């Protein structure tokens, strides 16, 4: 059956855009929204606390009348103060945003730097769905990055960015609130897994950057489309593709595999393995605790404004509560390998399962709802972020790849 023509990756719901520096605003608009939202929540809490106090005073004989008068005066003064803060900060930051729009080059230098990228990635983790929905230029579009800059998804750009482009690729996908720089080891410590994959197996490392605040399902669907166009745009015919995802990155890669199977995409045919490092397949206890705290804060009038602040965290963060589901009927020809770690040196220590790597429990990192060629490994004495550059983690990945390689 003839395959239907697909939309280019710059169109449709799951758009893939190379130019991440377009839009109407940058940091000032995001700061304006944050300041005004926080001011509103503080005002609500102030009103709730003061209201309960005045309610009690107005029920006491002799002082009820004066209390009511003080309440009117208090409410008028407080209201004018918060209104001034709201409009004053809004006007100042709106003016700053107007200046930013007139200086695009300066804005690009900031967002293109490593520090700027780190800040932008953190903003996207917390509010990325809002940034994307509001068209804010700080929303990160999915793209490969080389030296901090996006690479357009066309053959000429890929050929220029990867002069040693071969037929074997490894796409590395970072986790929540990070960018491609997280894969780099510290000075004198750890291994560069991307370079090791290229040196030992000939897989050219491609580093993906994306908006971690979007829903995991949406990012997975975007990645599925992205990989399909990478397959057709790469300068050489791709013979082998592996995906390496850390934390949320592994979940998004899993979602992409599900979506690719449902849509009959081509890239899974050349994809040999998906490797997940510390990915919370069954959810993260940290986000479940966050949800419990949010619910508790909503239980009283005084703390409800704080609950609304907590509830404003991005959909991507909230999706980590339980992890993505999987369709057991989805055929998976791709080998999937999961690595979980514990802070304790002994993975069988009673605290090992409970602590996990500090963010993800051992069970959530190694258990899964997926069917097919699945294997997992447990390694002790490694924290969540150390999984990215730990030599023992790479050694396990290398063993799996050698086992899967044809004789």
Q: What is the predicted role of each segment?
A:
Residues 112, 119-120, 131, 258-407:
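Helical cap/lid subdomain of alpha/beta-hydrolase-fold lipid enzymes
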Residues 162-165, 199, 235, 268, ...:
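Short, flexible hinge/linker loops that cap or flank conserved catalytic cores
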